[in-house]
From Swiss-Prot:
Keywords: Electron transport, Heme, Iron, Membrane, Metal-binding, Mitochondrion, Mitochondrion inner membrane, Respiratory chain, Transmembrane, Transmembrane helix, Transport, Ubiquinone. GO terms for biological process: mitochondrial electron transport, ubiquinol to cytochrome c. A ubiquinone binds at residue 201. SUPFAM superfamilies: a domain/subunit of cytochrome bc1 complex (Ubiquinol-cytochrome c reductase), Transmembrane di-heme cytochromes. The chain crosses the membrane at residues 33-53, 77-98, 113-133, 178-198, 226-246, 288-308, 320-340, 347-367. Heme b b566 binds at residues 97, 196. PANTHER family: CYTOCHROME B. Binds 2 heme b groups non-covalently. This is Cytochrome b.
């Protein structure tokens, strides 16, 4: 009799995706982040579901309902902080996962890569709308500033912003629809993640060497299930250290003040994981130009496969490209720091230089380094 995991229509899909999946024998810990992202997503959906049971999406009671969750609901505080800090963990894993894709040339799987970019946009939209829900000062003003950027679109901009707001300012209608979207989007993300995996399993995984590994595959279980569990334990350790010891470390103190349309906070800034894009947005004095730069800062990932000039897939044996890659990482950290600073003299210039650097490395320097390294191979 055939084993049930190989014959049952449903279990067979799970078996081919997580048990008998042929996997390269040499993939490193950088390949752990995909499974960690899946776990983060499930964690966010579950904690979010329990929060939604007690949350009210009304401007008069939203702030109070979040306070009620933290004070009166059984273990409400831990659910709320796991959800808030879980988002930070989600983005750390996302950046690591995308960075690994860039470093090892995984972007040559163009369908998987493009679905990944779409996933990144969707997760960013979800996180932004989630940040609005507690209805604190930074929630309200963050929503006002970011949605207002759409008014830079010629001709239809103003109408578009008012349509999204559901009125002439960020108010009850905005909060209600943001809650609805914030609830539905994670399930769309889940569907996209399944498509992402579907495309990946068409080609099989890449590996650190960038060479084909068809001759050297091992089953996913038990080798990589054990490896993923180790990654999961480290993720949970980091998350719980944050949640239990300094839950507000990554948040903004202004969000503990109820939203007040008559009082603007001195520095309006998004959560830390958007600061790099926010810095790029602010570095351009023109409103429409800034919005375009903001969108392009993520959309630029779509042209990375087109700009691949090297004969080698990954950067494992390409020292010049490696230097540029780590320069790009340092540049993104600089942009993240600048995004959290006030718009004053040294920070403006640093932000502009870092923004130019960001686009230059990806669009100009990386392709040139690939060509140079091709010539070095002939020596």
């Amino acid at each position: 009799m055939t084993n049930i995991r190989k014959s049952h229509p449903l279990i067979k899909i799970v078996n081919e995706s997580f048990i008998d999946l042929p996997t390269p024998s040499n993939i490193s810990a950088w390949w752990n982040f995909g499974s960690l992202l899946g776990i983060c997503l499930i964690l966010q959906i579950l904690t979010g579901l329990f929060l939604a049971m007690h949350y009210t999406s009304d401007t008069t009671t939203a702030f109070s309902s979040v306070t009620h969750i933290c004070r009166d609901v059984n273990y409400g505080w831990i659910i709320r902080y796991m959800h808030a800090n879980g988002a930070s963990m989600f983005f750390i894993c996302l950046f690591m996962h995308a960075g690994r894709g860039m470093y090892y040339g995984s972007y040559t799987f163009s369908e998987t890569w493009n679905i990944g970019i779409l996933l990144l946009f969707t997760v960013m939209a979800t996180a932004f709308m989630g940040y609005v829900l507690p209805w604190g000062q930074m929630s309200f003003w963050g929503a006002t500033v970011i949605t207002n950027l759409l008014s830079a679109i010629p001709y239809i901009g103003t109408n578009l912003v008012e349509w999204i707001w559901g009125g002439f300012s960020v108010d009850k209608a905005t909060l209600t629809r943001f809650f609805a979207f914030h609830f539905i989007l994670p399930f769309i993300i889940l569907a996209l993640a399944i498509i992402h995996l579907l495309f990946l399993h068409e080609t099989g995984s890449n590996n650190p060497s960038g060479m084909t590994s068809d001759t050297d595959k091992i089953p996913f279980h038990p080798y990589y299930t054990i490896k993923d569990i180790l990654g999961l334990l480290l993720l949970i350790l980091m998350l719980m250290l944050l949640v239990l010891f300094s839950p507000d470390l990554l948040g903004d103190p202004d969000n503990y003040t109820p939203a007040n349309p008559l009082n603007t906070p001195p520095h309006i800034k998004p959560e830390w994981y958007f600061l790099f894009a926010y810095a790029i947005l602010r570095s351009i004095p023109n409103k429409l130009g800034g919005v375009l730069a903001l969108i392009l800062s993520i959309l630029i990932l779509a042209v990375v496969p087109l700009l691949h000039t090297s004969k080698q897939r990954g950067m494992m044996f390409r020292p010049i490209s490696q230097c540029l890659f780590w320069l790009l990482v340092a540049d993104l950290l600089t942009l993240t720091w600048i995004g959290g600073q006030p718009v004053e003299h040294p920070f403006i210039t640093i932000g502009q230089l870092a923004s130019i650097m960001y686009f230059s490395i990806i669009l100009i320097l990386m392709p040139i380094s690939g060509i140079i390294e091709n010539h070095l191979l002939k020596w």
